[in-house]
Amino acid sequence: MHISQEGLSLIKKYEGCELEAYLCPAGVLTIGYGHIKNVKEGDTITQQEANDMLLHEMVEYEDYINELVKVDLEQYQFDALCSWVFNLGPTNLISSTLLKVLNNEDYKGVPTQIKRWNKSNGEVLEGLVKRREAEALLFENKPWENV
């Protein structure tokens, strides 16, 4: 499966787009839509480069999800997982209760597991609370845009 435009919209909303390198709330040098690889202080990019970087990175995350998830997914469920993995990384998915719950076909238990991941450095962040709520709603095919 591949992420849809709706999944990309969720990521873009919660990542925001910065065309100049900055320190994110977790203290990591970031640019574009949450891009953290090989970012140096003072780096700048164009909007098109930010969009291209996001699409390029999504291929890797899609592959991880397609490999790790052993049950059938609807597009909206896949999109929610793409946002979660994009934000948290595939390593967290591999070791998560979320993946265990999902692969046990407990689809109703997944939104609760999504929402558990709302901390950075042990501190609950309001932005992560909102993002996880939006991802949980999308996973259930409910409107998420107003979160």
Regions found by a protein language model. Name each.
Residues I11, Q77-V85, Q113-K115:
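Short alpha-helical scaffolding segments that buttress acidic/His motifs in well-ordered protein cores
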Residues M1-V28, Y33-D63, L68-D72, T91-V147:
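Long, amphipathic alpha-helical surface segments
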Residues H56, S83-L88:
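Short, residue-level hotspots on alpha-helical faces of the histone-fold
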